[in-house]
Amino acid sequence: LVVRVLLYFYIITNHMKKLLFISAIVFLSCAFTQQKKTKVIFFGDSITELGVKRDRYVGYILKMDSMLKVQKKDDQYELHGTGISGNKVYDLYLRVEDDVLTKNPDVVVVYVGVNDVWHKTLRGTGTDADKFEKFYLAILKKLKDRNINAILCTPAVVGEKTDYSNPLDGDLNLYSNIIRDIAKKNSLPLIDLRKKYHDYLDKNNPDNKDRGILTYDGVHMNDAGNQFLADAMWKTIKEIK
């Protein structure tokens, strides 16, 4: 009888060990196969700085976060904003190492150009077109050297009039064309905000107002503008593999 009991105990113990071993293998397998989140950094000026705030309006990056939760994709993406008010392209170049590369992102959305144009008349400290292109390309080289996916954005608006009577429309178009050419020559995804905003305003600004449709001051986004920006950016970001 004692032998039978011991044999039974041995069989049960062995069976339990096997079950525990199998459970451990399954657990570790799930842990290691868990999908790594795609880290996205939005790199830009005050529009991006406001993108992570809830001050006057909910910023576009926060809106995108909410969109991801609704779509049940928040376990797939990690969004970060590194925007500084007043920044131009050379400011981004000077801080790309500390604010972007050290964070090891998978995707960087480069959204700059408004201040390079706007500050020429506002403060006399804009960026000449040739220098803008050189600094922009230098930023992209740093990203490419680290195998980071770059998404380019054209500057949207400085004034919302649709008849091209905003004082800086000409320069904005010029700098947007520079970014378009860079994207085309380097086979990089482009979010053409300049075109998207103009197309939207053309249909939704019948009184030709200089602000109040997508921006509260002609430059910075109101609630509708932040949502428009979030939708436009997400459409491209989700295609990056």
Residue ranges and their predicted role:
Residues 30-85, 90, 95-104:
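Serine-esterase "nucleophile elbow" of acetyl-processing enzymes
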Residues 19-28:
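Sec-dependent N-terminal signal peptides
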Residues 35, 67-75, 91-241:
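Alpha-helical cap/lid subdomain in secreted, periplasmic
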Residues 23, 44, 112:
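Residues that line or immediately flank small-molecule/substrate-binding pockets and catalytic motifs
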Residues 27-28, 55, 202, 232:
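Alpha-helical transmembrane segments and their juxtamembrane interfaces
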Residues 2-5:
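Acidic, Ala/Val/Gly-enriched low-complexity intrinsically disordered segments
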Residues 13-19:
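Positively charged n-region of N-terminal signal peptides that target proteins for export
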